Amino acid sequence: MSQYKTSYDIKYSNELDEFLQNEVLPGLDISVDEFWKLTSEIITEFSDRNKSLLEKRKDIQKSIDDWHLNNDFDVDNLSAYKEFLRSIDYLIDEGNDFEITTSNVDKEIAITAGPQLVVPVMNARFALNAANARWGSLYDALYGTDMIDESDDAEKTGAYNPIRGDKVIAFAKQFLDQYFQLQDGSFTDVVSFSIENKALNLHLDNATITMLDDESKFVGFTGSANSPQSVLLTNNNLHVEILIDKSHSVGATDKAGIKDILLESAITTIMDCEDSVAAVDSADKLEVYRNWLGLMKGDLEEQFMKGGRKVNRKLNPDREYVSPDLSEFKLSGRSLMLVRNVGLLMTNSAVLDKHDNEIPEGILDALFTICIAKHDLKNTNAFNNSKSGSIYIVKPKLHGPDEVKFVCDLFNAIENGLNIKKNTVKIGIMDEERRTTVNLKECIRVAKDRVIFINTGFLDRTGDEIHTSMEAGPVVPKSEMKMQKWINAYEDWNVDVGLECGFKGKAQIGKGMWPMPDEMLKMYQAKIEHPSSGANCAWVPSPTAATLHAMHYHEMLVSNQQEILLSRDKINLDDILCIPLAQDIQTLDQNTIELELDNNCQGILGYVVRWVNQGIGCSKVPDINNIGLMEDRATCRISSQHVANWLHHDVISKEEVIASMKKMAEIVDQQNAGDPNYLPMSPSFNGHAFNAALKLAIEGKDQPSGYTEPILHQERLKFKAK
C-alpha cells in the first residue's frame, strides 16, 4: 500500500514524488511543486471529460444492444442500420477533404519505410534490445532461424556449422546481387573492395574491377579507402553495411573477407506502457517511467547473465562513416522511439484526486512520459532520440473523434504547463476500435497538426467488433474471422483514408504484428503483403524478425506503391459494417465447437496465468498445438470476447466453459512445468489467475468494450497483496 503526500488538493505516492525530485526533474526547467500544481490543474480540467467519454461509450453500447434485440441485421440492406448509427452519433458524416499539417517529423516516420518493434518498456533488457535493433546481422538472422533449412547436414548445431554458414552466405550475397547489382559479375566473385575517385571499386576473382550498376547506392565506408573495414550502401532509403575482416572466423572463409552484412532493421520502436505490460499500482508505474527516463536520458543500463557470463547492456552509440567525398557523417545507432500510453478506461492509485478517487491512468501517463521526454528535447547527450525535436506518443483504444480531440487537448495543456512548444507532442492513433475505424477521417481531422501515425490492429479491432455487435448473434469461429468481408475492408480503408489525408511523405500508415516469433520463413513469405498494401511500417515480434522483414522494404519502395494506391477507388463503408455473424452456426458439429472453445480457453489461461501471478504482460505463450505465439492483452481480448459471444447465444454453456477451463489449465500447467517461478492452477482451480481467466470468459459480455484490464488488474492487485 502506497504512502501519500498532499498538495494542491491531490495526493501522490511518496515513491513517485521522490522519483520526480531525484531523477526526473533535475536538469529541467520545472520544480516538483510546479509539476504537482500542473497535475492538479490537469486533473480538474480533464478527469470529468474522461469520465463523460466513458459514459458515452456505455450509452452508445446500450443503444446498439437494444437495436439488435429489436431489429434483424440485414447485410444486404444496411440503410436502416446506418441511419440508426448516425442517430446515436456512432457514425459521423465526413467533412471536406483536407491534408495533415504535422511539422518537425523525423525522417524515420515521415520518409523511411521499415519494420516497427513494440516492446514492454517495463522490461529494461527488452527495451534496450529493441532500441538497439536499428541495425541487425543478416547472417545471424538467417543462421538462427528456419529461413535456412537444415537439409544436407545444415543443422543448427551447438558450434558453428560451416555447411549451414555457406547457405547463409549464399543467401546474403544473392540479396546483395538483387538490390545492389554490379556492372559485371556477382558479389560471389568479389575478392576485395576499394574507394577511388568517390566510387566503390569491387575487385573480382578474374582480376578485373567492376562497380555498382547504380553508383549512387554507395554512400560511405569505414577504415582506409584502399582497404575498407566496411562498405555502406543504400536502397529505398535503407542502409546496408558490409563488414570486412579477413581475420574473423567467418571472414577468413570468404574470398572477399566479408564477416557479416548488417541491415538497417527496426526503424522505429514503440516503447509500450499499455497492452504488453502489467502495471497496476504506483510501484509498477514507477518501473515503467524509470525505464522511459533512462531511454530519454540515454543512460539506461541492464546487467544480466548470458552463457555463463555477465552482460552489461546499454544504448548503442551513433555509427560513424566517411562519405565517398571523404567527409565524415553519422547514422543513428538506435531505433527512433515512440511511447504508447494507456487508453481512457483505467485508473491508477499512484495519484488520487481531491475526493480520494484514483485518477485516469492515461492522464498520469501523458504527464510523466511527456515531462520525461523533455530531457530528449534538450539534445544534450550522445543518444538523442528525435533529431526534429518532437515527442511521439501512441494512443490506443480511442473511440471516435471526440476521444481523439480529448487527447489532443490534454497534450496541449501539458505542453503549456511544461513550457513545451505547441504541437511538439505528436499522436499516433491506433485504429483498433470500430467507432474510430468508421470515423477515421474525422479522427485524423481533429489531430491534423499532431498526427504522425495510424495503425490497424486485427486482434483488438476484432474484439471490439464482437463486443459492439454482441446482441446481433453468434459470430463465426475465430479461425474464419480473417476471411470475413469487414476485415479486408478495414485494412484497406485505413490505407485509403491515410493517403487521402496526406500521410504520404509525412506520417506512418502501419500494419499489425506477426504473432509467431519462431516461424520466420512463413513471416518472410507472407509479410511482403504489408508494404504491398501501402503501409510504410509493420509490427514484428523481435529484432531478428525486424532484420528479416527489412528485406521486404528493399524489394518495394512503399512511397511508389502509395502513389499507385492513391488512384484506386476508396473502400465502401458498407463492407466495414458487415458484422461477422455465423450464418450456419447450427451446422457446426460438437467436436468443432469444443475445439474452438478449448483453443480460446487455453490461450486465455496461458496468457493470464503469467500476467496475474508473475506480472508479465507480453510473452511467447505456447498455444494448444505447442506453437509459440506472442500474446498480449489484445489476444486475450479477442479470445475472451469470442467465448462470451458463443456463451451468450447458447452455442456453448457455462458448464462447458468451466470444464474447458479446467481441462486447459492442466495443459497450461504442463507447458510451464520448466519455469521455476510458475504457480500451477490445477488441481485447486481457485487461484487468482484461474479466477481471472474464468471471469474474462463468463463475464466478458459485461466488460466495458470487452476490455480485459478491469478483471486482470483486480486479480493482480489481490495477488500482490498476499
Region annotations inferred by a language model:
Residues L25-I30, E45-S52, D66-D74, Y90-E94, ...:
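Intrinsically disordered or highly flexible coil/loop and linker segments, enriched in small
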Residues S2-I92, I100:
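N-terminal-proximal low-complexity accessory segments that begin disordered
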Residues E15, F19, E23, L38, ...:
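Generic, well-ordered alpha-helical scaffold segments in large soluble proteins
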Residues T6, I10, L25, N50, ...:
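Hydrophobic alpha-helical scaffolding
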